[in-house]
């Protein structure tokens, strides 16, 4: 079983000793309810580091009013079992008041990149993400940290924060992991009924449709985005498409689509809000 730490002080003491022994530390920050996508992050961390630390913390500051903080799935026992299966050395699962004690005041503001796409629909979300990630980097002080490309905007923002604040950690991006039918793994998939899940597959199918259009010579981003939106919206349990955007790899919007660009979507299906993205292959 991995060592479980709840207190910053105890974790720091343990890791300080490991660093003194010359051990390299890989870090996977999560909100728990681990799935196959997390396993891939952990596997890569395990291959590249002497010590693997996984944090499990549902961070309240990245949830807005009326979002799913209270109902976000939690199961520490199951998470610990998965961590054990994947050879994790340390799990850090603090309480909220350990991370944000009474009187906590400071936050990281990420600027323009945090106001578009997800940021438009979840104001302040990325400031909350950046704040907790910087805190965790300061607590763990890892050599490398692992982030999935499924949360592509989050990944780009963390890269920006690390660069801008001179944080000495290597950010390692890990490709999206999909279920057999193409649905991207997400802790929020648990909210979907079987029928809703069927409708959620329209996201992946819309990427294949876009890829087909691009392969056939369509390069107009507006037309491709319209086709994606129309395809997803005609599925029965889709309550709305928050956005469909096509950007370069640094999230600058594109008018003409090229290989390597990103298609990013956010879709509300039943009670779940799902985000996904696709790297243009053609």
From Swiss-Prot:
Subcellular location: Cytoplasm
UniProt key word Ligase: yes
Domain of life, per lineage: Bacteria
GO BP term, example: pantothenate biosynthetic process
Residues forming the catalytic site: 38 (proton donor)
Chain positions recorded as (R)-pantoate binding sites: 62, 154
EC number: 6.3.2.1
Residues given in the record as beta-alanine binding sites: 62
Additional observations: The reaction proceeds by a bi uni uni bi ping pong mechanism.
Quaternary structure annotation from Swiss-Prot or TrEMBL: Homodimer.
Family per similarity comment: Belongs to the pantothenate synthetase family.
Role: Catalyzes the condensation of pantoate with beta-alanine in an ATP-dependent reaction via a pantoyl-adenylate intermediate.
Xref: NCBIfam families: cyt_tran_rel (TIGR00125), panC (TIGR00018)
Name of the protein described by the UniProt record: Pantothenate synthetase
Species for this entry: Aquifex aeolicus (strain VF5)
Gene name for this UniProt entry: panC
